[in-house]
Amino acid sequence: RIAAELIKYASNAFLATKITFINEIANLCEKTNINIDDISIGMGLDERIGSRFLRAGPAYGGSCFPKDTKAITSTAEKFKTNLSVIKSVIKSNNNRSKLLLKRIYQILNNKIKNKKISFLGVTFKANTDDMRDSSSLTMIPTLSKKGALIKYFDPTGYKNDFNKIKNVSFVSSIKKSVEGADLIII
């Protein structure tokens, strides 16, 4: 039984590592003015690496990666083994939303109050209605508390998690979400 669990944990930890790796490379690309998509495509052409899970974006979330990366490090600790790479992945991923918020503040010159911000997609990945550990769960309330006026659209029609947050509204189309926006977050 433990082998099957460890296979699942290790597989998901590896995929989480790939996502976190490309997000860190995206940070470097931003500083060096290189397009991360070009890097992702080039890396993906290498058969040893492959193109899946090499798309820079928000922190990983969902029901598996956060849970399984924590589970494998917990299992390792029980057996007095240090999984420093996976611990670093967890730490980097946890910092990703903070880094994205910092970029938003920079783009808007720290003037968040009354800025119209559009979120296109709020789930942890495309084509799902799963909000578990989605970056938007951190970012939207934080921006709202600073006075941003937020509209969001998600093609899955997801609209429940933000209903009670001041200055946040679900809209029924991309067009309505981006109309008059000072900043669009995809």
Model-derived segments and their meaning:
Residues 1-186:
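Structural/interface elements that position substrates and couple domains in central-metabolism enzymes
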